[in-house]
């Protein structure tokens, strides 16, 4: 699984763990990625998307089996 959002391109950032004694250790801040079945380039695909893109509505989720059926009211 790649550590990059396919929508916004968000990648891991580098920072520091800082203790109370001000000892510094390097660390990585990974984006919160979720594997989502979505419409991507006109096809239904599983893509890695960050939660901020999902929350902002930038991802069009693929219809599931139950959705999209038209029922007649007779």
From Swiss-Prot:
Pfam families: Ribosomal_L28. GO terms for cellular component: ribonucleoprotein complex; ribosome. It comes from the Bacteria. Keywords: Ribonucleoprotein, Ribosomal protein. One of its GO terms (biological process) is translation. The keyword Repressor does not apply. InterPro entries: Bacterial_rp_bL28, Ribosomal_bL28, Ribosomal_bL28/bL31-like_sf, Ribosomal_bL28_bact-type, Ribosomal_bL28_sf. The keyword Ribosomal protein applies. One of its GO terms (molecular function) is structural constituent of ribosome. Belongs to the bacterial ribosomal protein bL28 family. HAMAP family: Ribosomal_bL28. This is Large ribosomal subunit protein bL28.
């Amino acid at each position: 699984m790649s550590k990059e959002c396919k929508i916004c391109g968000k990648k891991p950032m580098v920072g520091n763990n800082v203790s109370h004694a001000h000892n510094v250790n390097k660390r990585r801040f990974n984006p919160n990625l979720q594997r989502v079945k979505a419409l991507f380039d006109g096809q239904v695909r599983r893509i890695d998307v960050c939660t901020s893109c999902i929350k902002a509505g930038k991802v069009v989720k693929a219809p599931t089996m139950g959705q999209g059926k038209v029922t007649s009211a007779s």
